[in-house]
Amino acid sequence: MFGAAATATVFGLLIPLSGCGTSSGDGGGDTLRLVAAEYGNTPATSSKAFWDKVTADFTKANPGIKVKVELLPWADIDREVSRMVASGKAPDMALMGSYSDFAAQGKLYSAEELLSISAEANFLQPLAEAGSVGNTLYGLPFVASSRLLFYNTKLFADAGLVAKDGSPTWQPKTWADLESAAKALKTKGVKYPYALPLGPEEAHAEAMIWELSNGGGYADSSGNYSLASDQNVVTFNWLKTKMVDPGLTGPTPPSQLNRADAFAAFLRGEVGMLNGYPSLSHEARAKGITVGAVAMPVSDYLGTGENPPTVGVADWMMAFKQNGKREEIGKFLDFVYQDKNLADFAGRYHLLPSTVTASRTPSGGGLDKNDEQFLTALRGAQLYPVNNPAWMSVSDTIKRNIGRAVEPGVSPKAVLEDIAAKASAASKRNH
C-alpha cells in the first residue's frame, strides 16, 4: 500500500463504493466524480462517512453541483485510475499515492488553475515541493505523516536503559547509541531489539529513514536518483554488520519482515525499537503500552551538529482535465480544503493535515501532544521523490529488492548498484 495511510487494511472491498455522497448518475453534466483511496479498515472507520458529509454539505452550499465518490482499496487504486485514464474515462479528481506520471502526460490541472493564491500558498512547504513538477504544483497534498523512532519504555526500563517510570527519556544521538540499546535489549531476551522491516510491503520507507540519517537518500539535490551513493552503501554495510549479523533485528530476516508484521509485534510487546507513525502510537497506548518517540539518531560518520531530515509521506489530490470541469472542481477543492474538513479527516486516521492553517487549528479528531511531535518533524521532512514520473516503478524495485542488501553472504553495494541500474532504466522509459 502507498501513502500516509499505509496502516489501513481495506475490509474486503471488491468493488468501488459508488454513489457516496449526494450524487447519482455516471459523472456527466454537473456531477463531479472523485475516485479516492479507502483509509478505514472496518465498516465503522470507512472514509465513506466523511465523504458523505462533505459532499452533502458542498452540494447544499453549491446547488446544482453534485459529487460522486468511489472508494477503492490502496492495493488497487493506482492501477485502476491509470486504467481509467488510459481508456479515456478519467475521473474529475483522484486521491491516491502518486500523481507525477499523469502530470508528465499533461493530464492534470495545476493548482493555480484550481485554487486561490492564498489556498495554494497554505500547503506545508515540504509537501508543496514534493507535489510540484518543476515549479508547478500538480499534486495537492491532502494528508501526511512523518516517522519517529519509537521505543517500548517498559522493555527499556527492564534493560536498565531508562528508569522504571520511563524518565529521563532515552535520547540517542548516534547509531552507536541505538546499537548499544539493542544489545542491552537482546541480553534481556527481547525478541526484536530493533525491528527492521525491509520486506516488500514498505521497505522503501525504512530504507530511506536510515539513508537520510547518514546524509544519503534516494535522490541528489538535482532530483536525480542516487540509490547507490557512497553514503547509502555505508548505511547498509553498517546495518548488515552491526545490527543484522549480530542478531539485533530479531528472528525474522529483515527481507521477510513487513511493516504490518513489525507493528503487530510492537503491539504485542515484542519489539524494543522501530520507526513508526502517529497511528501506531495511538494503538499502542490503547493497549497499555507506553511509547517513547525520538528523532532518528544520526550516523557516527556525520559531522557534529548535522541534523538530517526525517521521512515524510503524503497522499495526493489531483484534478484531471479530460472532462473540462475546472471551475466546478476548483469550487469543490476549495471546500474540501477548508480547515475544519481537512483537520476532521486527518484526525479520524491520526494523520497530519497538509496545510499551515489546518495544522494550527485542530478540529474533529484534532492533533494531540503526541501528534504535534510528528507535525514538527514533518515541517522539516524529506518526502519520497514522487514528482519523478519513474517513482512508482523505482519504489516498487526498492521494495522488492532492498532487503537483500542485509542478507548473509550478499554485498550491500552490489544490491544497491543493481537497484540503481533498474531505476536508471525506468527513468529513461519515462522521458
List each model region and its residues:
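Extracytoplasmic/periplasmic substrate-recognition and gating elements
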Residues: 241, 245-247, 285-351
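Conserved N-terminal structural module of periplasmic/extracytoplasmic solute-binding proteins
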Residues: 2-100, 414, 421-431
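A structural signal for short loop-to-beta-strand junctions that line the ligand-binding cleft
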Residues: 92, 120-156, 304-310, 381-388
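Extracytoplasmic/periplasmic solute-binding protein
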Residues: 137-142, 147, 175-226, 271
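Glycine-centered hinge/linker elements that transmit conformational signals in sensory
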Residues: 180-183, 222-256
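Short, solvent-exposed loop/beta-turn-alpha elements that line the ligand-binding surface or hinge
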Residues: 112-123, 166-171, 193-198, 216-235, ...
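Hinge/lid segment of periplasmic solute-binding proteins
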Residues: 97-148, 177, 206, 290, ...
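Conserved C-terminal helix/tail region of periplasmic/extracytoplasmic solute-binding proteins
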Residues: 157, 376-431
